[in-house]
Amino acid sequence: PGKTHMQQKQQTIAKTAQLSGRGLFTGQEVSVTFHPAPADYGIVFARKDLNGAEVPARIDNVVQQDRRTMLQQGEATVMTTEHVLSALSGLSIDNCVIEIDATELPGGDGSAKIFTDVIQEAGITTSEAPRRQLIINTPVSVSDGDAVVAAVPHDKPSLQVVYELDYDEHNAIGHQLHVFDFAHGDYASQVAPARTFVLEAEVRQLRAAGIGKHLTPKDILVINHDGPMGGNNYRFDDEPVRHKILDLIGDLYLLGVPIQGRIVAYKSGHALNHELCRALLKQYREQRRNQ
């Protein structure tokens, strides 16, 4: 079917790349080094401070945590992986070793931009190995209360994400709907810069629980009834829903392969995203068996 946007061969970064920062939840200083990896290696985190203990970015390694995605293999844990995985998925990187010297990835400004910037600067190389992918041919959906996320077939050879965010009317976020399609959208400029957001009321609860005491408006978007606080402005009119798309793309990359299909989400968060990912892994394994 002609040339499609879906990259047909596996890719990795062209050279080693580095960045550092502080964890969003822990506030710990952390250095990150991205290393090129061979075909079929996948995305693997390596804890430099734990003798290089590896944690593959796979749904089987997810440990349930509030408000973030956490992975564990053996003694090694890696926290807040969704933004870096979203950047790798968004830029079609199949294989990469992400070396870190603390448990949590850097938060940057709360978006995936620090990661897309460093990956694009390093450059991308293509191998001869064909890229495996999951083509959604059977609809699958998971829900929890009124929150739902579904994967359905798509008429284009690409991934499309439709997200509907619905906060109460009295909230500055309100109701937002955004559609991003890799067939004609540009992930690095349209999704990656969208920042993590919290409501002012939630910040008080988090601080009371001892979380995020170090955070300032440079680290995260705090929204009250008037909109962003602390001198921040929205980067997009619908920045909150775009960030939800960013998280969803990152969580779904725990499948280990790119998806061709449409993902439709309403009020979905990490736990539900992971549940969909598990259902898709089942579908992917069945497809591979029948090939």
Regions found by a protein language model. Name each.
Residues 2-94, 99-291:
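C-terminal regulatory domains involved in ligand/effector binding and gene-expression control
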